[in-house]
């Protein structure tokens, strides 16, 4: 299984930019995304672990370009699965709004049999040992889900999620969820590895108290630099 995350397609930076530099950034991000998809061709299943797009609603031109690239991947990789996991950019406080990610996920799932969607507040277990956890609407719901996933985990399992790790500033911010060191320790003591998207800087952490044969916390970082 190959994991990419935080691609932030349709990124739009205003401060200190010009129309041309914004267009250049847009083209760069899509070119890099295309390269990432090419690398994964016919290699393995692909997980996009949140924040496919930079915003809740994106420019239709960018949506169509993302659709073109993803449909090509799904058609060419018919024996592999594309897992689309919702991130924090894919939800809104208004329940009647549908995000660009949700539209993309629904269209691709309806068109291809090898697409699976893990929407807001949802989880899915792949291959029996990989637990995918999407963004949740608030920290309380997220904590409840983590507790349930912990019960289901066995040694050697992986939990893929879109959240901060041990970030005190995010603990009370529902738009940016947090896994505390204490929560992570319960997983690593069981020999489970947590793989985080959302944080843009890569790092590997071992929660204090983890046994020598325990798991770890891996923050992937984003593969296409668009911001810190």
Annotate each language-model stretch with its function.
Residues 1-2, 9, 122-132, 153-158, ...:
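Beta-strand-turn-beta hairpins that frame and shape the catalytic cleft
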Residues 4-5, 45-51, 81-88, 116-120, ...:
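Active-site neighborhood of phospho(di)ester-bond hydrolases with catalytic His/Asp-centered motifs
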Residues 7-12, 43-61, 80-96, 157, ...:
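Active-site neighborhood of divalent metal-dependent phosphoester/pyrophosphate hydrolases
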Residues 96-147:
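An acidic, phosphate/nucleotide-engaging active-site surface
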Residues 171-228:
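Conserved beta-sheet core of the metallophosphoesterase superfamily
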